[in-house]
Amino acid sequence: CIFVAHNVKFDANLLAEALFMEGFELRTPRVDTVELAQVFYPTFEQYKLSHLSKVLNLDLAQAHTAIEDARATGQLLFHLMDKIASLPRQTIEMLLTFSDNLLFETELVIRDAIRGQNLGLSKEYVMLEESGIVLRRPVAYKAERKLSQDFATNIALLDLESRPKQREFAEAVRKELDNTAISMIQAQTGIGKTYGYLLPLLAQADVDKVVVAVPTKLLQNQIMNQEAKALSDVFNINFHSLKGPQNYIKLDAFYQTLLRQDSNRLINRYKMQLLVWLTETETGDLDEIRQKQRYMAYFDEIKHDGKLKVDSLFAEYDFWQQSYQKAQEARVVVTNHAYLLTRMEDDHDFVRGKTLVIDEGQKMVLALEQFSRHQVNLTVLLQHIHRILDSGSQSLLQQRLLENLQFEVSHLIQEHQQ
């Protein structure tokens, strides 16, 4: 007999207290479905039973009712067991090296799942032999379907209804495509402008590749999860979300943390969560992990720094390198204002020959301001001036200029400290 609950620590204490009053003890193993859900559904936003019930279609008519909660928890456990059983055996074996960090006897569910598991690895996965880490194999792109020249037809194929203002905006975009100069189009919010500019662009045979820049990463993720997903599903359009390297997991750094003994239970649970996530993700984008804010120091340790050693175990499967390669091949690249500026500084040809759409262009000015700022550490600068003056190697003119600079910098520091 095993006691299973969603937040087992709380429920087990209540049950143990009730049994104690009757002269009994609770000695059965205890399994927590909250921690199991956190490990095996790494991209979920929440792990409340009510939220999991909506996402997984569990039977929970009335939350916080004992019978209803128990039924939904039982269904959740079956979902979790199926999910664990679907994972590669190699991943489950790695999970078991950290599973004693789960509450009470929760690891029993994982140990039970490995029995009868196939030793072979499915074609959808690839195992990096020396590390034992299993990744999802990249999926080949399907042949793109041709879009109609009629905006309303394309919207209908997406199972959406076109709106008058949206059609007007789309028509304005279509007309401007013949104009080789920069076009500026104003549109009110809430008209569905993302489809309004994407569909006319993608319908044009002479528009080869498109770069879309939006103000924030939040909007970037939103487009990828909504409009890009729909267009990819219906028309097989190849979209790619491009961000700075720090947004992606660095497999070398993650592997080093797997080799390390950590006493922090939360860190070890994150290691388990990431091992599961790596069998699912096609991007390696850490934004897919919604609960990472609980221990950002660990994620700062494993995020990419934009560098990759030639002899890296993961050179062939590095997510940041793959992301940049995918950006070269994608029909539509979605990025954000800040990273567009960074990318164009590093690669002057990044948008050459492509159609560039700057969504909410008025906000690009703010991004440019931020991008062009340079920081100077006044204390370090003052120390440097002192060293030069102490060396006595400068001419009289240089000495006077440095003394004036020394005075001004000292004055600035004093003003700041007041």
Task: Please describe what each predicted stretch is.
Residues 2-19, 44, 48-111:
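Acidic, Mg2+-coordinating catalytic module of metal-dependent nucleases/exonucleases
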Residues 25-38, 212-215, 235-251, 352-364, ...:
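Conserved beta-strand -> loop -> alpha-helix junction used to position metal-binding or nucleic-acid-contacting
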Residues 79-150:
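Acidic two-metal-ion nuclease catalytic site recognized across multiple nuclease folds
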Residues 139-184:
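Conserved pre-motif I regulatory segment
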Residues 152, 208-210, 214-330:
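A substrate-engagement module of RecA-like helicase motors
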Residues 175, 194-207, 226-230:
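Walker A/P-loop NTP-binding motif
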Residues 178-199:
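Walker A/P-loop
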Residues 313-331, 337-418:
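Signature of the SF2 helicase/ATPase Hel1-core->accessory helical subdomain module
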